[in-house]
Every structure is written in C-alpha cells, then in structure tokens.
Amino acid sequence: MRLCDRDIEAWLDDGRLSITPRPPQERISGATVDVRLGNRFRVFQGHTAAYIDLSGPKQEVAEALERVMSDEIQLGEDEAFFLHPGELALAVTYESVTLPDDLVGWLDGRSSLARLGLMVHVTAHRIDPGWQGCIVLEFFNSGKLPLALRPGMLIGALSFEPLSAPAARPYNRREDAKYKGQQGAVASRIDKD
C-alpha cells in the first residue's frame, strides 16, 4: 500500500523520510511528491564508438563508456538544455532523497511531458530502501521537436510504499551499490556488475 499525502508529510515531519530541500505542501498531492529538474546533465557522444559490447570484458566496457559519455554539463540558472528527437541524455533531480530501510520509492514522469514525447525515466524507476542521493533521470525525446529543459521545472513525481519489514540489504549498506550517494548525472557503471 502506498503512502498518502498525510502519511508522506508525517514521515517527513518525523524524519523517517528525507527530501532535501523539503517540498512545500502544494507539491505533495494524493500519493505523490513532485520533484524538479536539477542543473546537471550528461549526453552520449555516439560518434566516438561503433558499439558497446555490454557482455564483453569489463575493462573494454569501461573504456567504451568513457569514450561515449560526455563530461558532466552544469547549467546556469537561466540556461536550457535542449534534447533533440531520438536523443538520450542523463540528468538529475534537484532534490536529494533519503529512504529508510523499510520504504521503497517509485519515480514516474509527468503525463504532460510524455504527451510531448519526453520520457523522463526510461527504466529502473524503483528507488531502493536505504537510498541516499539525487535521482538520475534517463531522458529520451521520442517526439518530433527539440525540447528545452530548464533547471527547476517540475519533472516527475515520487510515491512511496512501506515494506513488510526493514530490508536486510538496504542500498546504503550494500558493498556492490554502484550509485551510492550520487549527486550528479552519474553515467552507467555496468562495467561494475
């Protein structure tokens, strides 16, 4: 069962759930909390590699990822990031989220953006129990026109679901947690699998 708005506010009030900066009451509705777009992005430089062999030797995968991912792009307050049709980019939420060991989060993109062709979170919309950090967004423009994305715009909504018991292996205590504490648009670390 997912938390309703009153429960989300109660979990925020008593510190079991942390969203920084704390969202104002008008951004908590029904069963979700709106999240905004941060100012950090990464893009793929497709011309730098013919392909990535995802099941190849780890070192080769790491080298290919290093070639195809841009350095992090940080936008100023009034700047826009343009996502062109058919392009994939990584971005990050403005908010940092900390989940307790007995709560899982779910991120959904906004329907209004999807209707323009913007996929906000292509896959992996689960936020694990014990998560701490910003949430990396996997943008894809499936529309016909370039889309201007600006830091601070509403980009998605989080919902939360209590677990039957605290997780035995929450994300923040796992040795193999590849994205622990991320604050920027962290590129794929599939080579760490």
UniProtKB/Swiss-Prot annotation:
InterPro entries: dCTP_deaminase, dUTPase-like_sf, dUTPase_trimeric. It holds the Pfam family DCD. Pathway: Pyrimidine metabolism; dUMP biosynthesis; dUMP from dCTP (dUTP route): step 1/2. The active site is at 138 (proton donor/acceptor). The keyword Ribonucleoprotein does not apply. One of its GO terms (molecular function) is nucleotide binding. Belongs to the dCTP deaminase family. HAMAP family: dCTP_deaminase (MF_00146). This is dCTP deaminase. It comes from Edwardsiella ictaluri (strain 93-146).
